[in-house]
């Protein structure tokens, strides 16, 4: 155990900086439904786009390798109406080699830093899919993964808190 700690420190006693390498990234699952074309909705309809983001991370079998996934659900509906234009579901995964991250910081690292690294590629895929589906390219805004992580932690803590009876 002490040998592992010594290996993690440099000669000057400082802890080594966290290191991350992207080993690969891929689309695990994708679905695009062009409901407008199926139902013949007017093409000049003003869209109201709703985006839902979920994150997931898990350890892989190889040492120091982790999987971080961004699960995106995009629904575009007609503004001032309830007709759906399109639905896009995308599960995008990055495989990472992570070193020098303390165990207590690993979970936030995998759900904040890793998604931040692969998000630009996911954004391009979403833009291409919507364009190829007959719509203007959907350019997603940047996602604040730190806020998303904090909000999820707060939601889980509030749902696990014991309820007081009067």
Curated annotation (Swiss-Prot):
Domain of life: Bacteria
Membrane spanning residue stretches: none
Sample GO molecular function, one term: unfolded protein binding
Disulphide bond pairs: none
Compartment(s): Cytoplasm
GO biological process terms, semicolon-separated: protein folding; protein tetramerization; protein transport
Keyword Lipoprotein tagged: no
SUPFAM superfamilies: SecB-like
Cellular-component GO terms for this entry: cytoplasm
Assigned keywords, A-Z: Chaperone, Cytoplasm, Protein transport, Translocation, Transport
One Pfam family this sequence matches: SecB
Major site of localization recorded for this protein: cytoplasm
Subunit: Homotetramer, a dimer of dimers. One homotetramer interacts with 1 SecA dimer.
Family: Belongs to the SecB family.
Job description of the protein: One of the proteins required for the normal export of preproteins out of the cell cytoplasm. It is a molecular chaperone that binds to a subset of precursor proteins, maintaining them in a translocation-competent state. It also specifically binds to its receptor SecA.
HAMAP family the record matches: SecB (MF_00821)
NCBIfam families: PRK05751.1-3, secB
Protein name: Protein-export protein SecB
Organism: Roseobacter denitrificans (strain ATCC 33942 / OCh 114) (Erythrobacter sp. (strain OCh 114))
Phylogenetic lineage: Bacteria, Pseudomonadati, Pseudomonadota, Alphaproteobacteria, Rhodobacterales
């Amino acid at each position: 155990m002490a040998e592992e700690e010594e290996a993690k420190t440099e000669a000057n006693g400082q802890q080594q900086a966290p290191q991350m390498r992207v080993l690969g990234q891929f689309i695990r699952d994708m679905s695009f439904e062009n409901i407008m074309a199926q139902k013949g909705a007017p093409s000049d309809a003003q869209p109201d786009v709703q985006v839902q983001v979920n994150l997931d991370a898990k350890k892989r079998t190889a040492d120091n390798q982790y999987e971080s996934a961004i699960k995106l659900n995009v629904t575009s509906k007609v503004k001032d109406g309830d007709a759906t234009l399109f639905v896009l579901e995308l599960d995008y995964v990055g495989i990472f080699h992570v070193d020098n991250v303390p165990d207590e910081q690993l979970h936030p690292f995998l759900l904040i830093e890793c998604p931040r690294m692969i998000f630009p590629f996911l954004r391009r895929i979403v833009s291409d899919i919507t364009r190829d589906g007959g719509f203007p390219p959907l350019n997603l805004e940047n996602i604040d993964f730190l806020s998303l992580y904090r909000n999820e932690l707060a939601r889980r803590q509030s749902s696990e808190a014991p309820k007081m009876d009067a």
